[in-house]
């Protein structure tokens, strides 16, 4: 429904300097006027995009809050509808009270993502741009933010439009033969179509190849630190974070629960997980932590396996190495600053079995730069894409690109095998429609609802 007026709190719930209640729809001004008072009663006639000082009153005439009201006339708004944003003090009570007044005076509580959905349905944003809004909100590094802003700016949409335009050119050439079957396609024309089709396939596949990097920028890499108790796992976490987040003691088994933190490693977000030491234990609480650690290893994209240069290798170390299986693993020999090392370089290389081994001192911070380099190399082959490179970060977009490439490949193969041109045209249309799913020109209403349901209320 686009003919009603919606309202929601648009800022995170909690205590803060400012909180915003957003109202959008044909009656946004009418709703706000019922509980917002300022010296000028016809404030909505003073022009759009203005900030107005006043007070919010409840039905009994009591002041709820001292506020600044932003008034924006359609169509120059986020939703392309009339929008009123009430900037309150950022406490839970005043925000909820203002929202209650908006709902009591004719607005409906917005569904998750409904403001962005209206922006899409009203032509303010295409679907790819609308999805980038949530990516901007959730971005964890500058690289992730850069990818999301590029998408909001329309870089992906323009690329899709370009690919679709060239596909339509191919389709026009093929369909001309359907309309005039007596005019066989000349050999030169066939070669042009094949060459153009293959160029399009390679271009789309290159975008798909970069999508894995985009997914990493968007979602991060789940990285788990494991090892037996007291080898320096928590010290490593603190060293990477550059702060004391985890408890560090000489008592084995100090970490009994999972500690999760996001860190930025050269533009790559790592969800880094410090686990309980993996060992057999009679302590019921510690045993729960050990089981959680095992689950974290199973779900991890990257494992940092910590060994202790001061104490050497034990049966527990070998048992842990077996548990990581075929995971991406970096072996880290900690406490490399001790004089008498009980692990040799040859011994560490032997148990790593060809996997990377790094020597560090989490206490002194030595070796961390090389560790960061190795993480980037393991995760992205050492490649951090240039700022002007188009990268897609959304799995839905990648799958649509893959379908488009597959349909195009079918069309090219069909031309080579002299398949009837109407069948080739079907594949070309399917490729065009697959690309249209990215920007929303060829999606179903059900899919649109599912996409925006993932947004937060107020956005």
Swiss-Prot record:
PANTHER family: TRNA MODIFICATION GTPASE GTPBP3 (PTHR42714), TRNA MODIFICATION GTPASE GTPBP3, MITOCHONDRIAL (PTHR42714:SF2). The keyword Cell wall biogenesis/degradation does not apply. Binds 1 potassium ion per subunit. (6S)-5-formyl-5,6,7,8-tetrahydrofolate binds at residues 22, 85, 124, 459. Residues 220-380 form the TrmE-type G domain. InterPro entries: AAA+_ATPase, G_TrmE, GTP-bd, GTP-bd_TrmE_N, GTPase_MnmE, MnmE_dom2, MnmE_helical, P-loop_NTPase. K(+) binds at residues 230, 249, 251, 254. The keyword Nucleotide-binding applies. HAMAP family: GTPase_MnmE. This is tRNA modification GTPase MnmE. GO terms for cellular component: cytosol. Its EC number is 3.6.-.-. Exhibits a very high intrinsic GTPase hydrolysis rate. Involved in the addition of a carboxymethylaminomethyl (cmnm) group at the wobble position (U34) of certain tRNAs, forming tRNA-cmnm(5)s(2)U34. NCBIfam families: mnmE_trmE_thdF, PRK05291.1-3, small_GTP. Coiled coil: none annotated. Its main location: cytoplasm. Mg(2+) binds at residues 234, 255.
């Amino acid at each position: 429904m686009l003919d009603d007026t919606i309202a929601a709190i648009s800022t995170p719930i909690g205590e803060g300097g400012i909180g915003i209640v957003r109202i959008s729809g044909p009656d946004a001004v009418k709703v706000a006027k019922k509980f917002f008072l300022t010296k000028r009663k016809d404030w909505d006639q003073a022009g759009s995009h203005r900030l107005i000082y006043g007070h919010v009153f409840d039905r009994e005439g009591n002041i709820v809050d001292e506020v600044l009201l932003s008034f924006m006339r359609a169509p120059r708004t986020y939703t392309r509808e009339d929008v009123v944003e009430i900037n309150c003090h950022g406490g839970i009570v005043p925000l909820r009270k203002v929202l209650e007044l908006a709902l009591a005076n004719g607005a409906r509580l917005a569904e998750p993502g409904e403001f962005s959905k209206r922006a899409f349905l009203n032509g303010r944003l295409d679907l790819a741009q609308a999805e980038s809004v949530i990516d901007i909100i959730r971005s964890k590094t500058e690289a992730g933010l850069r990818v999301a802003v590029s998408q909001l700016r329309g870089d992906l949409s323009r690329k899709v439009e370009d690919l679709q335009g060239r596909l339509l050119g191919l389709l026009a050439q093929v369909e001309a033969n359907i309309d005039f079957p007596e005019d066989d396609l000349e050999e030169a024309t066939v070669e042009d179509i094949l060459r153009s089709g293959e160029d399009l396939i390679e271009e789309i596949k290159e975008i798909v190849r970069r999508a894995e990097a985009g997914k990493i920028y968007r979602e991060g890499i789940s990285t788990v630190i494991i090892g037996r108790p007291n080898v320096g796992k928590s010290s490593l976490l603190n060293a990477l974070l550059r702060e004391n987040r985890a408890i560090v003691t000489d008592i084995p088994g100090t970490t009994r629960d999972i500690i999760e933190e996001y860190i930025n490693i050269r533009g790559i977000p790592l969800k880094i997980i410090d686990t309980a030491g993996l060992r057999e234990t009679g302590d019921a609480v510690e045993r729960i932590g050990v089981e959680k650690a095992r689950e974290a290893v199973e779900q991890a994209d990257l494992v940092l396996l910590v060994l202790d240069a001061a104490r050497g290798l034990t049966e527990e170390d070998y048992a842990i190495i077996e548990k990581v299986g075929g995971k991406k693993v970096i072996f880290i020999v900690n406490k490399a600053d001790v004089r008498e090392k009980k692990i040799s370089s040859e011994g560490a290389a032997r148990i790593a079995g060809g996997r990377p081994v790094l020597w560090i001192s989490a206490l002194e911070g030595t070796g961390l730069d090389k560790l960061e380099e190795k993480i980037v190399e393991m995760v992205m082959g050492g490649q951090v894409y240039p700022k002007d490179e188009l990268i897609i970060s959304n799995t839905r977009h990648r799958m649509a690109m893959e379908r488009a490439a597959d349909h195009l490949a079918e069309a090219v193969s069909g031309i080579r095998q002299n398949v009837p041109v109407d069948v080739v045209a079907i594949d070309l249309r399917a490729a065009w429609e697959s690309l249209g799913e990215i920007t929303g020109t060829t999606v179903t209403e059900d899919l649109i609802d599912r996409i925006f349901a993932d947004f937060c209320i107020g956005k």
